[in-house]
Amino acid sequence: MENIGIDLVEIKKIKKIGKDILAARILSSEEHQIYQIIQNPQSQLTFLAGRWASKEALFKAFQTPQKIDPTCQNYCNWSILNDKKGAPYVKNNTCTTFFNPILISITHTDNYALALVIVKKLPQSTS
């Protein structure tokens, strides 16, 4: 079964919430390390907006009739990282529900970040 999730985040909404408050709520430890390295405030906002949109889209894609492990539903247990070519990928070390593959695309403008996620839930092993 394949599911799709999409989310759009307005960057000025993050300004209202507060960058550091949102970072503490949604970023994994790996993402937080990347966030702290970013010096430009606008780049920090864009980074947060992309991660927030990605995780919202991911959770929307998880809304299936099957039971999802509660550890899969915590923002901080998921990392949206980038490979050597800059392409985003999804990482989770705590989720016991197995999804493969998880495909993700993130785009942004000066005002918005949008993420699209496609997940395929594999059947659980009967052994």
Curated annotation (Swiss-Prot):
Q: Which UniProt keywords apply?
A: Cytoplasm, Fatty acid biosynthesis, Fatty acid metabolism, Lipid biosynthesis, Lipid metabolism, Magnesium, Metal-binding, Transferase
Superkingdom in the source lineage: Bacteria
Which Gene3D superfamilies did the record assign? Answer: 4'-phosphopantetheinyl transferase domain (3.90.470.20)
- Please give the catalytic activity noted in the UniProt record: apo-[ACP] + CoA = holo-[ACP] + adenosine 3',5'-bisphosphate + H(+)
Q: What is its EC number?
A: 2.7.8.7
**Coarse class of the protein's main subcellular location:** cytoplasm
Residues binding Mg(2+):
D7, E56
What is any one of the record's Gene Ontology cellular component terms? cytoplasm
The record's Gene Ontology biological-process terms are:
fatty acid biosynthetic process
Q: Which GO terms describe its molecular function?
A: holo-[acyl-carrier-protein] synthase activity; magnesium ion binding
Coiled-coil residue windows: none
Task: Cite a single Pfam family from the UniProt record.
Answer: ACPS
Q: Which InterPro entries match?
A: 4-PPantetheinyl_Trfase_dom (IPR008278), 4-PPantetheinyl_Trfase_dom_sf (IPR037143), ACPS (IPR002582), Ppantetheine-prot_Trfase_dom (IPR004568)
Q: Where are the transmembrane segments?
A: none
Q: Please list the cofactors this protein needs.
A: Mg(2+)
The subcellular location is: Cytoplasm
* HAMAP family attached to this UniProt entry: AcpS
Report the function annotation for this chain: Transfers the 4'-phosphopantetheine moiety from coenzyme A to a Ser of acyl-carrier-protein.
> Can you tell me which family this protein belongs to?
Belongs to the P-Pant transferase superfamily. AcpS family.
Q: What is this protein called?
A: Holo-[acyl-carrier-protein] synthase
